[in-house]
Amino acid sequence: MSHEELAEVLAKVLKKRGAVLRGDFVLSSGRRSSVYIDMRRLLGDESSYSVALDLLLEVGGQDLARSSAVIGVATGGLPWAAMLALRLSKPLGYVRPERKGHGTLSQVEGDPPKGRVVVVDDVATTGTSIAKSIEVLRSNGYTVGTALVLVDRGEGAGELLARMGVRLVSVATLKTILEKLGWGGE
């Protein structure tokens, strides 16, 4: 499928689940937005998350196949990483935003094998959450070359990750999703 076709399919699923919301929202980056993509709404319908999973595999399949593990960014990326890992029979891990103060004190959970991993999140905005996860992974001996997301909001994530030597791969951009929904730009 072309990038346009992938975006069209994702836009339909997002519309079906009411996952593109208008209003006044504060994003995890701290930025305000009049549009919010709530990927968690896809999780409540197996046909919707199955389609989204297939789209992630379409754009990230080669990188995922070469990876030693799939790593989710807590919390939005964790369900997608888990489904990808299960589908591909790959080890799964996730990065906590902060080191916990009890138990093993680990920030990388699941003890996935060291090597080249793919980092997965649901939506990329500025890329700060993904970048922090990559820094934690690298400091723990992992190699990261690809971050995979369903939607790139186009607010700097790709550029930030590129400066770290990481390629951001997305199913669609927010701009394209809004165009496919007939909403125009944000």
Curated annotation (Swiss-Prot):
GO biological-process terms attached to the record: 'de novo' UMP biosynthetic process; pyrimidine nucleobase biosynthetic process
EC id: 2.4.2.10
A Pfam short name: Pribosyltran
Keywords assigned by UniProt, alphabetized: Glycosyltransferase, Magnesium, Pyrimidine biosynthesis, Transferase
Positions of 5-phospho-alpha-D-ribose 1-diphosphate binding: 96, 100, 102, 121-129
InterPro entries with a match to the protein in the record: OPRT, Or_phspho_trans_dom, PRibTrfase_dom, PRTase-like
Record-linked NCBIfam families: pyrE (TIGR00336)
Protein's name in the database: Orotate phosphoribosyltransferase
